[in-house]
Structure formats: structure tokens, C-alpha cells
From Swiss-Prot:
Pfam families for this protein: TPR_27
Name of the protein this chain belongs to: F-box protein At2g35280
Domain of life: Eukaryota
Residue ranges of every copy of the F-box domain listed in the record: 8-57
Species this protein is from: Arabidopsis thaliana
């Protein structure tokens, strides 16, 4: 082995676009796995601030506990700047219910709902209905497809009726 030759790892040999795609796919599934991934090596860590990664980063743990996002302000700011639906939902919930900025942050919940975030669709629909914007609220509610009966329930439905 030649001591003057610098060896590169297989990961370093991959194109940066592919590395960003890997990090983005991991981020969609789990924020914890994303965090571990970007800490694992500098090549993957370089993709941490990529627009595609931040737009699709799964913030499900923060969606469940929005007030805990105060511990993660930097990643929240980055995700908001890249139109991450989860980040908009979290900001909207905090500002709407906790800080009482109803008009401004109904907008953030709306962005999240339009981005397909299920909790945001429900919350936005309910808030619109409560504000008297009935048709708009019904439109968002219909996106949840609750009116459709799943096939498995149709099969079970007849057997479980109480008479």
C-alpha cells in the first residue's frame, strides 16, 4: 500500500445528490434516524441542510407534543423556511392555542393542511367550521375520506350488529 495515496471511502465516492436523497428518505421515516444519520459521517451530515431533506423531514414526535419544539428551534426554523407541513402545523398550533394569535396562525395550519398533513387537515377543517366557514371546512373534512367505509369493515359490519 502506497503511503502517499489517500483512500476514500465508498460513501465519499457517491455523488452528493445521491447522498442527499439517502438523507431525505431517512428523514421522511424518522427524525431520530435522520439525526443519527447526519451525525454518523460528514458526507451525510453535509446533506442536513438540503431543501428536499428539510421540506420532508418527519416531525411526528413534535406534532404529538408541539410545546416540546422549543428544544428544537433551529431545526424548526429551517423546516419552516423550507415549507415543511409538520413545522407549519406545529407553529400554527402553538401560536393559535397557546399564544392566542388566531388569525395569523390559522394561516400556518392551512399551509400544513394543504401540504397533506392529516392532523392539520382535521384541525383546519374544525377551525373553519367553528368560524362559520362551513363549505370550506366541509371541503377539508372530505379530504380525510371518513365517509368511505373501508372494505374490511363492510365484511365485519353485518356480523357485528347487535339486535
Amino acid at each position: 500500500m502506497d503511503p502517499n495515496k489517500v483512500e476514500i471511502s465508498r460513501l465519499e465516492a457517491l455523488p452528493q445528490d445521491l447522498l442527499r436523497e439517502i438523507v431525505a428518505k431517512i428523514g421522511v421515516k424518522s427524525a431520530e434516524d435522520y439525526h443519527n444519520c447526519i451525525l454518523s459521517c460528514k458526507e451525510l451530515g453535509a446533506s442536513a441542510n438540503d431543501e428536499r431533506v428539510l421540506k420532508t423531514l418527519n416531525l411526528a414526535l413534535l406534532v404529538k407534543k408541539p410545546l416540546s419544539c422549543r428544544k428544537h428551534l433551529l431545526i424548526m426554523k429551517k423546516c419552516l423556511a423550507n415549507n415543511n407541513p409538520d413545522a407549519h402545523y406545529i407553529k400554527g398550533i402553538i401560536w393559535y392555542f397557546n399564544l392566542d394569535h388566531c388569525d395569523v396562525d390559522l394561516h400556518h395550519i392551512g399551509i400544513a393542511a394543504n401540504g397533506g398533513q392529516k392532523e392539520a387537515i382535521y384541525m383546519y377543517a374544525m377551525l373553519l367550521l367553528c368560524r362559520g366557514r362551513t363549505e370550506e371546512g366541509k371541503t377539508y373534512m372530505s379530504q380525510l375520506e371518513w365517509a368511505k367505509t373501508p372494505p374490511w369493515l363492510k365484511r365485519v359490519g353485518n356480523k357485528s350488529k347487535l339486535h
